Amino acid sequence: MSVWAFAFFSLFLSLSVRGSAEQCGQQAGDALCPGGLCCSSYGWCGTTADYCGDGCQSQCDGGGGGGGGGGGGGGGGGGGGDGYLSDIIPESMFDDMLKYRNDPQCPAVGFYTYNAFISAAKEFPDFGNTGDDLMRKREIAAFLGQTSHETNGWWPAAQGDQYDWGYCHMNYNYGLCGDDLNLPLLQEPELVETDPFIAFKTALWFWMTPQSPKPSCHAVITESWTPSAADSEAGRVPGYGVITNIINGGIECGQGGPNNANENRIGFYKTYCDSLGTTYGSNLDCYQQRPFGYGLLGLKDTM
């Protein structure tokens, strides 16, 4: 299996979902966090105020170091200070857009925090910071739309709208991106399961990193990608649909439509665009696009 195939399967597919994935406290038989980390009220381990502040269950001095902790401080990359991403998507809007992510019925309750998202994004200074305000908002909506589809916890009898249930399930982002991020993800894949900062950071790495012949999702949504002759012949035109093709084209694209997966991704995207006050752009689906990685005679290249 190639680097790309491994990254594809490990970074954006929910490989398994647990009924309860909490790590510590009363949610996990009063277990303590490793390395002296704080145990949050929701049963997750970390070092920031989300974990060591109100409701902390044990080891609340946060004595462990840990890899980023999922919280608010730091983050390299120079993506700007508090006036960066938080100007476009303040915490109140994040909470409203992902309003059920902390519902007790969600396996990932309490895991995906706003501070973890903002801190991880600062590691990628071009994310949500390219182009005018409409484009910046469109990229955030596209990222949250695609990742919400991968972590969706909605079911037909659930309260609220289908597109209110993003970031409900865990999404296990292992992979060779650890080499780029200097994280031992192959040896310690549980880092993604236990640290929301790392979970967001690996997803953003996937979003920002091209994997030939695929462009990066960032390049597509910021209109800096120009289709090659092969792309044009395959019907791959700029727009949100190409991002779906990048992520899961072999299953969801080039088969006509509609299909539930495409429509779900588009539904999340439109909902978040509306919340952020931006336009959708064109070419939202990939129904008429051949997947990347198809070679001569229409046979799928061996990855």
Swiss-Prot record:
Q: Which reaction does it catalyse?
A: Random endo-hydrolysis of N-acetyl-beta-D-glucosaminide (1->4)-beta-linkages in chitin and chitodextrins
Pfam families reported for this sequence: Chitin_bind_1, Glyco_hydro_19
Task: Extract the signal peptide range.
Answer: 1-21
Keyword list (alphabetical) reads: Carbohydrate metabolism, Chitin degradation, Chitin-binding, Disulfide bond, Glycosidase, Hydrolase, Plant defense, Polysaccharide degradation, Signal
Q: Which residues form the active site?
A: E150
State the EC number(s).
3.2.1.14
Tell me its family.
Belongs to the glycosyl hydrolase 19 family. Chitinase class I subfamily.
What name does UniProt use for this protein? Acidic endochitinase WIN6.2B
Upper classification of the source organism reads: Eukaryota, Viridiplantae, Streptophyta, Embryophyta, Tracheophyta
